[in-house]
Amino acid sequence: GMMALGGMSYLTGVYLQSVLDMDVLAAAIAGLPMACAVAIFSVGAAKVAAAVGTRNAFVGSVVLTAVGMAGVLTLGVDDGLWMYMLFTTIAGIGFGVQFSLVSEVVVGSVPPERSGAASSISETCFELGTALGLGLLGSLATLVFRGGSDGREFSDTLGDTLRTADGLGASGDALVAAAKVAFVDGMHTAALATTALLTVVAVVLAFVMRP
């Protein structure tokens, strides 16, 4: 879950600002529905688990996250803001339930005197997942981005490429268009990989986790 959140949050943040040309404040506001979903369902995760069972809550949350990540595939170069807000909110519901239940299960599986250590391990895993998501998914997206240059002089990142294009005047328009398309292709590839991984996780949880 944290791999998906860390990696895709970074990529979609770049998408909003560099592809859709939104400023930082507007991009942050676009992310509020997801943040609210995470907060609300983190608080309500225990009630969800009590209603449907812990295993079903876990599996359902991972499925929702996978649906949200799959929705990133609908985002295009020229539009995608509303679809972004819709699908990241869906993913946020899944993230909220997952994060709360993971901590609860980890702490609840050890004696009370070891709950502090268990909680620390859980937090460390969250941080590690975020770092892995940024590294692996970011690298995958960058690989696809650079591969989509078709001989054009792309810089290492989309932002650097756009700045280079700005200095070329009218002749840089084609470079801007190609760079944005290549970045979206990279983001889509990362989203597809994330969706596939989450789907596998959901299936495994459904079979190996106790109700």
PLM regions: where:
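12-transmembrane solute porter fold
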Residues: 1-145, 188-194, 198-201, 208-210
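A membrane-interface helix-boundary motif in multi-pass transporters
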Residues: 23, 143-195
